[in-house]
Amino acid sequence: MQIRDNLAKDYADIYTPEVLAALAFMAGFNDEQQQLMAERIERRAARIRERRPIGFLDPNARIPGTDIRVQDARDGKFIGAEIPPDLQRQWIQGTGPAAKPDAPVRSSLRNVAYALLSGADGWMFDGEDALGQISAMSLDNQRSLKLAIGRDPLFLEVAGQVAGEMNTWSRGFLGREIVTDWRAQLGFTTTIFRCRGLHLDDRHIRVRGRSLSAAIVDLTLYVVNNHLALTAAGASIVLYLPKIQTAGEAGFWNRLLSALEGHLGLAEGTIKAYVLIEQLEATFQLMEIRAALGLHFVGFNTGRWDYINSVSDANCWDPAFINPNIESVLMTYGYMRHYEDRVRRAVNTPDAGGNFALWQGGMEPNIPVGSEAGVASSMDKARAGAEREQREGASGKWVAHWKMVHIIRPVWEQAGAANQLGRPFPPLGYTAADAADLTLLEPGPRTIRGARNLLSVALQYGNAFGQGLQAAALKAADFFGNDDILYLMEDMATGEIRLSILWEWLHKGATLTEDDPETGLKTGAVFTAALFARLLDEEYAKLLAADHRDVHEGSKTTTLPIARAIVEAYVTDPVKYPWYIDLLNLNLNNHDLDLARARITRYMDEFKTSGTRITENLDTAPGR
């Protein structure tokens, strides 16, 4: 096992002897992880070749890697977990990373202090879509969490300062203080960690010359470094598992968790896991995923952006499948409505022990920063969205900023129940009609305004990613300076879905549903390559001209041109690539546009030739 540069020494507090021993043990799963990802790409390629939609599993089949029959999983004939006390009430879970790009430890610890003093019932500290990956940010993230969970004196000093700052804001915005006894309040919020998905490689570690799975690294570093402190505090070890596409992949995660528990001498099922349902294929296998994770599984989360992206990508072969403006694809829209309904039915199907699971609702991306009118309008919409999810059966939801906790949490507080476990819903169906509902399109606008929004935010997000800001407050450039239009806190998913929809519109001959005075285009005009090129030039020019508060001045000659090159290549190529993040990852810490273009071409050529995604860190790859 090789750790690049001097990181083993610089992060000796993270790469401890115990961690290194566990990594060496867990690295035994690396080949299986790579095989699973090869199978994932082949399933996708076969569907595209055969123009075949995703379907339900054969009820008589076995879930790969397990001895569980599909029909038994659907019938609840498996042993699941009881929900531990500190997850029984999770009305609001905040989300965000525990590190900032190129920041001192004290600065990053402020992120953790804001989170743990926010009053959220849980906080998902992100190692995935919201965590920048420049330099050694994944290790900075782990360091912050270890210091905070262990209640290091430096963290406690920072937390005391942050408590006062939070009260200053809350007195002005809420008319009251939200932190009374800050030391006691640190123990209120359940600490949760999201690992990177199986589709990503770690940027720092190689085993026998091959990159080690980022999922294996994140899982091992977090659990080994923190399980003793969490257990001593009476807290659960809780993870979010992202981007799972199949029950077979869930079974692999289950084996990872069980193996690490065994290595550490922990009882089977000590580690608890939520699964983010952000992939269309997973929605066809919800009960199977529950069963495959067994004693580790506690609940599902319904995202929005990543899920829309997965539906778009899974139907890239179908010329009739064209999404409307992204703003129209709400949780009540066509396929999203049916997706949410299947999740709530799945968690409320009892297992063999009579246990139900949790449904954690989707993300609220609004931030209460802007004009008085803009904030009031956005907060009304945010509360209405939370009220809808609570009515539909969610036991809680996510917020993207600590300030939103006290705006959204009262929705569940007023409802009163700790959770909605066991709320009765009709049983899941597995008919052709049920399958069709999961890709149901409904009429919606498809406009130049919508295209500009897609492009502007996709470019800005790619730029932010290159700067190490995978969680970024964004809005389309046309609304810069308009405080009535609020910024939304976005992560990698926002870039993925925007490029997928632009690719759909361009390569499937999407037509506009409204006249556009600025371009002179009429209803029925086709979204052509020439139109895309024009909009790309115009939206890029707006970002170059933007104030440094919206687009960092230094990025305009470094990471922004690379973001443009990636967006242009991804959207215009007739081949639909599975991940925007792949092309961004290949260019982390790179500001050379020519090198970026060469890497983009190399990735695309490799994918077209062999179906292989280049996911390793090219800066440290053998032979480069």
Spans of model-derived segments:
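Subunit-assembly interface segments of extracellular/virion macromolecular structures
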Residues: 32, 36, 40-50
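Conserved alpha/beta-domain cores
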Residues: 1-29, 36, 52, 57-78, ...
